[in-house]
Amino acid sequence: MAVLVGSAATQAMADDAPASAVVGSVAVVNDYLFRGLSQTNWKPAVQPGIEYDHASGWYVGAWGSNISWLSDASTDAAHISSSVELDFYTGYRGSFGSGVSYDVGIYEYYYPGSYPAGFTRPYTTEVYGSLGYKGVTLKYSHAFTNLFGFYDSKHSGYVDLSYNVEFSPGWTLNTHVGHQHVKHVAGASYSDWKVGVTKAFDHGYSVSLGYYDTNASRSVYTNADGHYIGRATGILTLSKAF
């Protein structure tokens, strides 16, 4: 499941990029969270991303990370080898000219590896749209496939409300609340939230520290190791934009 700790850095660079440019980032995090859930069983991740932004507003990009949530479920009888997430996306962003920005696109989450017979593949395709105004962004993502391996979960959706504001030169307050609706899967829907700060440095470096939590069901979101992946946690992110 794709992060938005790492991909947010790429997104921010894209917003500030000159006309028709290639931008990218690489981030290191102490735990990869996606929509509040640990994807690496509380272990570090390295997350590179690259994006091409056309002067017209069209863009295309790719992003990746190591993961463990799939291989953590592997058994001798049902072996799962996937340990990498590769994401591909394209879209169009612009402004209405009144300070209101918009962004629409399609996002593919891909997890290469081997899976046992009958295992619902985690590959997920979402379309998304967002509106932004003065640091506030409202985004909706809609899955046209099963959602990250949940059987019969097509047309699940995620609502994301965030507020990011620079409160001092180089310092940004980051807040977010979201809700994941998982269709046809009892107990799988949940909400998540965060509050954090980002410090920007010269030459594209930045450091972020955030507090994250969810109300995800322990019975649904406890992995094979007995770890509840929706617990409250702190995330440290070191990133470099280029």
Positions of the model-derived regions?
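Cleavable N-terminal export/targeting peptides
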Residues: 1-21
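Short glycine/proline- and aromatic-enriched beta-strand/turn motifs that initiate or cap beta-hairpins
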Residues: 15-70, 233
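Structural signature of outer-membrane beta-barrel channels/translocons
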Residues: 51-57, 91-95, 130-136, 164-166, ...
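Surface-exposed loop and membrane-interface regions of Gram-negative outer-membrane beta-barrel proteins
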Residues: 38, 58-121
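Residues that define the transmembrane beta-barrel architecture of outer-membrane proteins
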Residues: 20, 42-46, 82-86, 100, ...
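Transmembrane beta-strands of outer-membrane beta-barrel pores
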Residues: 28-34, 54, 64-68, 94, ...
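Outer-membrane beta-barrel "beta-signal"
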Residues: 195, 199-205, 227-242
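Repeated loop/turn-to-beta-strand initiation elements of outer-membrane beta-barrel proteins
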Residues: 22, 56-62, 98-102, 135-140, ...
